[in-house]
Amino acid sequence: VELGQVEIIASRSSVKTDAEGTTYRISMQGLPPKAKAVLALKRLPGVITRMEVFSLIGARGSATIYVDEVPVDPKFLSTLEAADIDRVEVRYMDHNSSGEGGAIYIYRKKAEHPVLKGDLDLSGGLLRPSWRLTPSLTLYSRAVDIIANASATYSHQSPEFHIYRNDHPELSIYNRAKVLQTGGQVFATAELTPRLRGTLTYAHFGLQSWHNSQVKQQGMVTSGKIRENQMRHAVNLLLAYKLGSNNRLLLKSYGSWMLGNDTDLRGMVDRINSRDVLAEIAYEHNEASLLGLTHRLGVGFGGRLGRNSLYDGFAPYRNRQLRAYVRDNVSLLEDLSLYFILTGQWGEYGRDRLYSYSTFTPSLSLSYELGGYTIGLRYGHSVQHPSADLLSPRVFYRNELEQRQGNPHLGPQYTDNWALSLSKQFGRHSLSLKSTYWHASDLITSVYTNQPNVLTYGNAGIGDELSTTLNYSTALLSNQLSLNLYVGATYADYRLAPSYRARALSYGTRGWSLEWGGSVNYYHPKGWLANLDLSADGLSRSLSHQQEEEPQLMLLLQKSFFAGKLDVSIEVSAPFGWGERMTETTFLPGIIQRKEIRISQSNVSLGLTYHFGGEAKRPMKALTTSPLSLDDVKRSDL
């Protein structure tokens, strides 16, 4: 299907639909020659952009981003060029990703001749002191590809917090902060043999902040300094060995290490030392014949070890898990596709006492093509185990009215998710409608039990959410104008579990909320680019709170000079302070608590980006160890 800005492609020309996901090839027409992947993904139907965070229509949470099947930080998309992308797969169900946000898989092209190129990006704030420096370098060759970047961001911020109880001011916090964020990523891919390909990634993230804080409560003023330090390292390794033209063996490993410490106004220091290691082996067969049908099969087995020390005087949190899965994608008919995942997990977690578990979580997706419409039905069951900070019995101090205490006896949370979708492509337009029902039992949530100043955690709730989202995308003016818009409504009902009704102060929340927004891009061939991102998500609810945020807006205007070698840009974030405020309301017996938060986002930034390096001498081809090679991909008969 040709949509102008993207083209829907399929692995088998005889199949009209795929229950696993949709594969797109993105056109460079209407994009700047040096456009990055983050701009290209905004063209995909069913993909929602919220301030350069990508999510899928109707999904809970953000989508996990993969490049050549290795997970990357979304900021990596600002380094990868759109012209280097072969295709993009959008999957609402993914066996590699945790959570319920789905995944976006990006597969790169392979250069036949060496290419060395890069960028140097520098920007500074005009209204508030801030600057950002981001150099990047890309090397493509026959043997190895390397994409590397580094970043440093510095800003002055002035967040404020005000707490009211029954409309009476109780506490105010004023901060004057200096924040330094650093980061770097290296993405390396090597053709070790004609059949063996390896991909190694390393990422570093650092945060340092210095706060001069002032607290006003009941006529008393307390001043002091707060310091925050965080550092995280993450490594991914993927080895893919092609056994034949349609089957391969995968070895995946992941490791992360995080260190951090926070100092509060009392001089107390909270420290964390977290380590996580994962390894998995998988086998995939893309053309297996069984019962007269062609299957795309996959099986995998792996293990995970985690250790988290909070330095709170208690034993470290430990997590050990074995995981196995089987998945199958089969076309039952020319216009009917089935995809399912069955995952088994066995493990234990806890601090002094380890809790053992064994779970099986099925996921199922059906896709049916009827008269040009694609109808999808999905079901997923998942189990969520509590994290280390929720299990610590120590009281973590934020201020006199906001203290949090973990619960070492927390159990798992069980969720079920049903989704019904309808999509249609006509001309250069795409329309998608998706309705979802989400149910959670033994909900892991914050709850007030003994006093309104201390929030603890428990399997205290039952949650239900019913939502419907409509997405419309199109390309106009020879693809120069791109629109991707969404609007949705959600009814949420969070209520106390029977075991907590007699002893909890929280009431639960329920009601409707509306979300809308999208992305609009215009590119003129003479080098002008305009991009507008708008996100208005209205109310969000949990068992103890309801939260309302102002709409967020970001506007970018860019002009290219010297044959596209230099870009000059102006970026406007949260104009006139619109989007800086958030209100959190809590309902307790005899108390309505309202917390107003204002963060520092409003700014106008001037940026310069210098592009250097050459292009490939010949057209790029797809990487050979991807599940679908460029030679195997054919246009769908849709």
Regions found by a protein language model. Give the residues of each.
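Gram-negative outer-membrane beta-barrel transporters
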Residues: 437-439, 458-540
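Outer-membrane beta-barrel translocator/receptor signature
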Residues: 98-104, 112-160, 179-184
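Transmembrane beta-strands of outer-membrane beta-barrel pores
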Residues: 122-126, 141, 152-156, 202-208, ...
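Periplasmic plug
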Residues: 48-93
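N-terminal periplasmic accessory domains that precede
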Residues: 1, 37-40, 55, 75, ...
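Outer-membrane beta-barrel signature, preferentially recognizing the C-terminal barrel domain
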Residues: 373, 383-432, 437-441, 454-477, ...
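Short, acidic, small-residue-rich periplasmic hinge/interaction motif at the N-terminus
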Residues: 1-30, 51, 92-94, 101-103, ...
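Face-selective signature of the C-terminal outer-membrane beta-barrel domain
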Residues: 183-207, 226-369, 374-375, 430-437, ...
